[in-house]
């Protein structure tokens, strides 16, 4: 089909069905593709993808979710680095960090109002890279494209930073392995294929919990459904912060990495597993760490109350702020 002209005089394929960006929308979106390598604002109220888009039909793509506070995206460099790693695993074109960084900055200058919280004005910012439509259906061969979106952080997420979450231990269902052992399994890549993660959350929520922590058949702790696991142990003045060992099918967490770096500078010792359920039950604190939720204390595990020190949570949140 023939290309169409937007009001901004930018030629784009008709299959994107674009209109000019509407500032009254709660979400703000920038599209980057072959025709618009630097990105253009698009209207999020109209279809932006083809019906045969492989990101939509197969989950064939990668993404990053970030937190913006007062229009500044936290840990942007770390997220772009992980996005590049994920794209490489899927044989997608390497994202260009400077172009993406510039597009994110433009997005945040124009984004609609975020959520007002104790931290300031907060937005969720997502970068999605899709493989694009299948060549068998479309003759245009537009190739992979990128969407960058900003929207207000939901109040329910902010609430969990202080009130915490109830978690359940669930078996992963398969033994994790070194990330490089079977590259076609995409271990360690942040892909669009999140159906299992969402099914896990529905499963635990139907049983009165908020989140899940995966364990192996040997009961070794892995990670949350959409988060990293942090565990604190304080004894005789010695403070140690643990997380499960990396490179065993665990997605490297940018939030976990930021907290660890600040804790190290503050004199904490760091440990990288292995961790088992008993370590969590006997700890001085357990948290689920992710980019937008930040760190949420786990108040109950399998129905059993865990140690929960609000001051310790505040300390770790302060460490995270230092690394942003």
Model-identified regions with their sequence ranges:
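Short linear motifs in low-complexity or flexible loops
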Residues: 3-5, 13-14
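Intrinsically disordered, low-complexity polyampholyte segments enriched for Lys and acidic residues
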Residues: 5-7, 22-23
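Residue-level detector of transmembrane insertion/anchoring sites
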Residues: 8-12, 180
């Amino acid at each position: 089909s023939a290309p169409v002209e937007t009001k901004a005089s930018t030629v784009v394929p008709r299959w994107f069905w674009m209109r000019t960006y509407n500032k009254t929308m709660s979400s703000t979106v920038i599209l980057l593709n072959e025709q618009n390598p630097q990105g253009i604002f698009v209207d999020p109220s109209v279809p932006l993808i083809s019906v045969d888009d492989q990101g939509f039909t197969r989950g064939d793509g990668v993404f990053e979710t970030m937190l913006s506070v007062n229009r500044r995206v936290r840990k942007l460099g770390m997220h772009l680095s992980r996005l590049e790693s994920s794209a490489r695993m899927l044989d997608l074109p390497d994202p260009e960090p400077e172009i993406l960084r510039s597009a994110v900055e433009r997005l945040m200058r124009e984004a609609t109002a975020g959520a007002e919280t104790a931290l300031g004005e907060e937005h969720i910012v997502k970068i999605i890279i899709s493989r694009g439509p299948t060549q068998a259906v479309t003759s245009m061969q537009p190739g992979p494209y990128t969407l960058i979106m900003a929207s207000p952080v939901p109040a329910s997420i902010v609430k969990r930073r202080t009130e915490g979450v109830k978690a359940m231990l669930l078996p992963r269902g398969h033994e994790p392995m070194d990330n490089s052992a079977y590259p076609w399994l995409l271990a360690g890549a942040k892909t669009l294929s999140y159906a299992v993660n969402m099914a896990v959350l529905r499963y635990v929520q139907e049983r009165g919990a908020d989140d899940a922590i995966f364990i192996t058949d040997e009961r070794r702790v892995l990670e949350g459904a959409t988060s990293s696991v942090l565990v604190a142990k304080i004894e005789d003045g010695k403070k140690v912060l643990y997380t499960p060992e990396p490179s065993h099918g665990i997605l490297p967490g940018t939030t976990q990495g930021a907290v660890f770096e600040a804790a190290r500078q503050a004199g904490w010792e760091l440990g990288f597993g292995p961790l088992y359920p008993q370590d969590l039950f006997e700890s001085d604190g357990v948290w689920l760490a992710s980019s937008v939720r930040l760190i949420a204390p786990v108040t109950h595990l399998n129905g059993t109350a865990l140690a929960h020190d609000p001051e310790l949570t505040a300390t770790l949140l302060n460490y995270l702020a230092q690394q942003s």
